[in-house]
Amino acid sequence: MAALSSATKRLGRLIPHSSVLFVCDVQEVFRGLTFQLPTVIHGTNTMVSAAKLLNVPVVVTTQYGSRLGSTVSEISKNLEDAPDVKVFDKMKFSMLVPEVERHLTTNMPQRKSVLLCGIETHVCVLQTCLDLLDKGYDVHVVSDAVSSSTSYNRSMALERIRQSGAYITSVESAIFQLANDAGNPEFKSISKLIKEHLKVQNGFDTGARI
């Protein structure tokens, strides 16, 4: 069993019962200030929907919410019926503040794979990733659900994250990894979710800024 667990970690497998979804600081104030934010919101929302289908808990943070506002309405609305979601406000850039770490260790100690979405890739997402890696978590950064103020900062940060040992994935790939099998009871719903997701253009596939 120990050998299997080690191999699973090395390969970066995503399994619902050992995973948690992190949504980092996708706040109203960043509309118009973040490269391809509509794509980030859409991708993050698809991840939230998949988490609800597959019983993956969600951890959401806001950065200095009293000044910078709440999570964008599209995501907040989708989270309303999530069975396991906790929202934390913070001042530190990393999501792994003591309250979040306590929530993880107390309520979900078996969940050691973190799917990470949000902004900004070169600041809060990067620092969250490094802190999680330092604590022994596998980190899967969902590349079409993270961004920065500029395309350059996003690209640089993804490379830095890769250098540190995290996995870079996509919305579609991560969800199919979690589902794992066309025999999954939720596969029809997952397939429909992916089809709906792909109807919206991925802004990171183009040079246009939205």
UniProtKB/Swiss-Prot annotation:
Enzyme class (EC, first level): hydrolase
Reactions that this protein is recorded to catalyse: isochorismate + H2O = (2S,3S)-2,3-dihydroxy-2,3-dihydrobenzoate + pyruvate
Coiled coil (residue ranges): none
Keywords: Host cytoplasm, Host nucleus, Hydrolase, Secreted, Virulence
Gene disruption: observed consequences: Leads to a significant reduction in virulence on soybean seedling and increases the concentrations of both free salicylate and its glucoside (SAG) by about 3-fold in soybean seedling.
Pfam family, one: Isochorismatase
Active-site positions on this chain: D25, K90, C124
Compartments it resides in: Secreted; Host cytoplasm; Host nucleus
EC number: 3.3.2.1
Function statement: Secreted isochorismatase required for full virulence of P.sojae. Suppresses salicylate-mediated innate immunity of the host by disrupting the plant salicylate metabolism pathway via hydrolysis of its isochorismate precursor.
Protein family according to the UniProt entry: Belongs to the isochorismatase family.
Name this polypeptide is given: Secreted isochorismatase effector Isc1
Species of origin: Phytophthora sojae (strain P6497)
Lineage: Eukaryota, Sar, Stramenopiles, Oomycota, Peronosporales
Gene: Isc1
